[in-house]
Amino acid sequence: MAGSITLRLFLLGAFASQAMASCAYGTLLHPRAEGKVEVNTFGYTGKTGPTSWLFLDPEANAMCATGTNQSPIDMVAGENAMVPASQLNLEIPDMTEGTEFENLGTTVEVVAGQGSMRFGNTSYTLQQFHFHLPSEHLDAGKSMAMEMHMVWESADSQIAVVGVFIDVEDGAGGSPAGNSTSSQPPASTPQARKRDSFKMRRSVPHNHDHDKRQLPGVGGSFFHVNAPTTAATTPSNLLETVFGSVGEISEPGTLTKTKSLNMAELVSTLAAGSFQTYEGSLTTPPCSEGVRWLVSDQKLSIKTSTFHSVQSVIGFNSRFPQGALGEPNTLDALAKMVR
């Protein structure tokens, strides 16, 4: 087991040094360039899209077409272990002076460099968070408007990514679609099905032996983040502030500085729920595996007008859902079928 972990970390470092990777950008695996914004060379459609990532660099991007624990995946109730937010010791200080906001060509990214999280016996520092449109992970087969990826790194270069779904305000006077409120939508509506999907996840009985196998070192006493017990039901002030500057970085390679960012709101929202966790991969080239994923059951929301502003800059930037963990890579299987 130790040997396989060492190999994964070696490959992760080797691959990330050879390719542009949004997911790992700003970490020790792929340091941020001083004084400029590097524009990614891969894409999401045509000859540079996910089905062609292998051919952009066959040696570096081999895992994109052969890896068997690839991300994103469909987040289905009971498929992966659940971790209460109270076990993550999640702390992110406010960025009162604002921070850099960059257009990498394939996403827009907020530079962090501060914030702490602990998973099992490993401590992580928040490096950056970026966005995908639509969501890369699925919620029981359904995509969401967007997904935020918060990229964390440990002292020994292990990577963890916190995924947070982002909904668009429904325009009905407050609650965003998909979030739970005191006035629940009818059970047959899409909003209710999204809501009930997360409720099912949180209520599925745990197989503790299964949890221990997937999550060594998680358990015992952990610091509990004090937070309200309900998810945010209005557009996120944090996201509205960040995206308020998105028009300033409409061109790849540009950057600006955000206004003051209140991270406490985000911490409170995440701390109100749990995370479905699994070991997967970067969702961008080189698709390296050994990445710890923690996908929150709490959704954020933005205004419809904000969504359109972001969409005009990002466009489409989602990798297609991958097969079940441990199964043959879809691209590899298809290649063998047509030989």
Walk through the language-model features, giving the residues of each.
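Alpha-carbonic anhydrase
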Residues: 4-9, 13, 17-339
